[in-house]
Amino acid sequence: RDQPRSRGLGDVYKRQANGIKVYIFPSLRPTPELSFAVRELHCTAGIMVTASHNPPEYNGYKVYWDDGCQITAPKDTQIINEVKAVTDFNDVKTIDEEEARVRGLYNIIGYDMDDAFIAALKKQSLNGDIIKQVADDIKIVYSPFNGTGNVPVRRILRELGFKNVYVVPEQEKPDPNFTTLEYPNPEDPKAFTYALRLAKEVDADIILATDPDADRLGVYSKDTKSGEYKSFTGNMSGMLIAEYLLSQRKEKGLLHENGAFVKTIVSTNLADLIAKEYNLKLIEVLTGFKYIGEQIKFFEQNNTYEYEFGFEESYGCLVGTHARDKDAIVAVMASVSYTHLRAHETEADL
């Protein structure tokens, strides 16, 4: 729709009128790519206009700082105080697009940013050759929940070698009203109604769904014994990804001696056992992935630990440090890599 884009561009022009250089994507992009781009472009901050995994009436802001992480205290309070200080919107400076372009304040981000983002994800792939050997035999159903994941998820699956990818047609194209979804959240079983129907039609091995801003991943896998599709909680899928990644890194000699595993305090204690198994420092943080992303900056500033993996039970994890927020696209890559490294076994079996 025009309205959300117009509202976003209005904010852009206000920043430019205050002499702030702005980079804007030419079309919708996933939240983790925004986090990535903030650091790539050496920006002071980043803004994502999104309803995230909520109904459209909750459309709002996610704000990132120069490290690519969502803001935490005290910046969050300071920003809100500045917003409250505006009593008359007529006092807000604005500028037209042409003048902003001439002054070098309005900049469209090129498609090379997409390439750089995908390249960063692929660096986390551990068994590319093995995966390609079995990829032809795997059927994947995917839904972007009418959001931003459609293009990058299909691209990463294609570049990994997966050809049998079936996208839920009713939820493929961007739809700011989420017409087919009461609640576009991978945690909600009702959100998988269309995906499950398609999976049964094509006899899919696995179902993947990303929330509209593509930072949360939901997974269903076919039980080879019953033929039914079973869902995985955020704890389950997070631990499967963690075990796969850490075991493969250990086997290949890629684990850091001072590695750290970060989780939120409400997430499963199984993470403690996995961290111990791989001799990693377990760090617990408050609920919210921004506190996991914050730890990466602490590690770098203080030269203490190397980030190995982070997750929260609400269907979010981060593999690598290319972004500083949860990333469903890299989680898709890790999930299919884990599941199909064993060729004809499924996550339900494991």
Regions found by a protein language model. Give the residues of each.
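Phosphate-binding and adjacent anionic-ligand microenvironments
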Residues: K200, A204-I206, E228-K230, Q248-L350
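Single conserved hydrophobic/aromatic residue that forms the stacking wall/gate
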Residues: D2-Y13, H340-A343, E347-D349
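Glycine-rich phosphate-binding loop plus the immediately following alpha-helix
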Residues: Y64-K93, N235-N258, K263-A271, A328
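Short Gly/Thr/Asp-enriched flexible loops that form oxyanion-binding sites at enzyme active sites
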Residues: R7, D11, Y58-W65, D215-G234
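N-terminal small/polar loop signature for handling phosphorylated ligands or for N-terminal nucleophile
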Residues: R7-Y58, K163-G218
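Gly/Ser/Thr-enriched, mixed-charge loops and adjacent short helices
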Residues: N59-T193, L198-A199
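Extended, hydrophobic alpha-helical segments in both membrane/secreted and soluble proteins
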Residues: C43, G149-V153, A191-L196, D203-S221, ...
